[in-house]
Amino acid sequence: FRMRGHEEASGTKYVPQELLDRWAAKDPLENYVEFLRNEQLLSEEDEVLIKKEIIHEIDENLKMAFDESEVESIGSNELNDVYKKFVYQEVSPNSELRNIRLVDAISEGLKQSMEKHDGLVIMGQDIADYGGVFKITDGFVEAFGKERVRNTPICESAVVSAAMGLSIKGMKAVVEMQFADFVSTGFNPVVNYLAKSHYRWNEKADVVIRMPCGGDVGAGPFHSQTNEAWFTKTPGLKVVYPAFPYDAKGLLATAINDPNPVLFFEHKALYRNIYQDVPTSYYTLPFGKAALLKEGDDITIVSYGAGVHWAMNTLKDHPEINADLIDLRTLMPLDTEAIYG
């Protein structure tokens, strides 16, 4: 029971005095003190001493706060505090290649990161024995056990919050949204817990949220959204959206290494339709570096995800169009130099 509002502007005039009196009699602090007295565990002298120590601690810390210089908000300082510092370390791939699909590249990259990071936990609906609806984690339980590959209830807000808790304990977490649409029920912990944790209290949010998204697979309006725009303007989040298997594997490794929260979008229509030669070893790719897929003088096309393939098909059907084609790969950070250059 709340005896007063949670902040200065919240009043209690609407609460009957009788109700306040009834709950005041149940005050656990007062009752605990009375219990200690009755058990002869707390003398009057001890009580006075404890209260003096508490008041002294409060006064000392208040003085420290009041003696500090006035806070000056400087734009550069504010922006520098949005993300936890991350020093990207490039890991080059080996020369052995395998022609695989986008879905295979994501699965392979996730598995290799599980092997690299003992403290990495994957969570999501039906991802354990069943292997997830897209089978990306198929066989992971046998390889890593159910403590690290965890089925979750249908409660996205709880799953994202649990991932944040793992990060605070020094672990890493990858959350699979069964479909990107479902992130709406976990929106608050994504944009208010994960995104703001470093800016507010210097705490990392070492969480990757995998987001199977997009239409063209007959999944209907509640399983086909491409909702990356919800997050690209939320300070503290990073947003990745690869179009090719090679990029997906390397960018996923970087996302898991990054101590900041990353939303990793995967267009479902590309899962089993796009093939590419991909290195078999573990490797990383940097965020914020777009790929120039085609050079031309007439027009510049900037896209990401499935849009890259739509552009490639259009240019193939219209050879008279001489265009630059830029694949952004990451939307936050955004490679503005590639766009405007």
Where are these predicted regions, by residue range?
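Glycine-rich beta-alpha junction loops
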Residues: F1-M3, I54, C213-G215, E266-Y271, ...
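A beta-strand-loop signature enriched in Asp, Gly, Thr, and Trp
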Residues: K13, N313-G341
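Glycine-/acidic-rich phosphate or pyrophosphate-binding loops and their flanking alpha/beta elements
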Residues: A105-S113, K249-P261, L270-D317, E337-G341
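Short helix-loop-beta junction
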Residues: G139-K146, W230-K233, W310-I326
